[in-house]
Amino acid sequence: MASRIVTREEMLQRVARFKELTPSSRPLVDAVLPQFNRQIFSIIGGGVTEDASMKVPITAVDGFHLSIIKAGPKKGTGLHNHRTVEVFMPLTGTWSVQWGDDGENELTIGQWDVISVPTGIMRGFRNESAEEAYLLALVGGDDPGRVAWATNVMSAVREKGFDLDANGKIVEIGR
């Protein structure tokens, strides 16, 4: 069977140059909380981001979404769940991954290690390094759906004056 023909122009639409990416500083609603402050570079597909202004360079999604997370020391994400597998690989630094309804389970992964977090469980991650670090993240599926946040995370977010609208995007609600 002959392969299909893809032009250079078509292939260029599937290239993302890191130096040209603009990260979101509020990629998900939990980032309004200091301990979850981080940036996300969405590269292939929008993943589960809740930032309506996020620009994604590669919009052709073929079964997965790819992003890079940049976080300072002890920064990460709040406990959350979504309907797809999530895969993490530290590009730099050391990261912890938590899982369980209260994040009661935890393990640490280092540069180039990989963890595949299964569906149906709360999960979170944190940069355990003394310096800023990068984490590669893949979310499975063409449509990974929306994030389901732990109750305590959403309560803290609302106390800061933020919430999610009907489309799952971040909105300011005031205090």
Where are these regions (language model features)?
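Conserved metal-binding segment of the jelly-roll/cupin
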Residues: A71-G72, I109-S129, G140
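A short, N-terminal "cap"/entry segment at the start of jelly-roll beta-barrel domains
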Residues: M1-G63, D165-R175
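A short beta-strand-loop-beta hairpin characteristic of the jelly-roll/cupin
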Residues: N81, V85-Q111, I121
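Double-stranded beta-helix
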Residues: A2-E10, G124-R175
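Conserved short histidine dyad/triad with adjacent acidic residue
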Residues: V48-A52, H65-N81
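Short histidine-centered beta-strand/loop micro-motifs
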Residues: K55-T59, T77-H82, W99, E106-T108, ...
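Short, surface-exposed charged micro-motifs
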Residues: I68, G78, V87, V114, ...
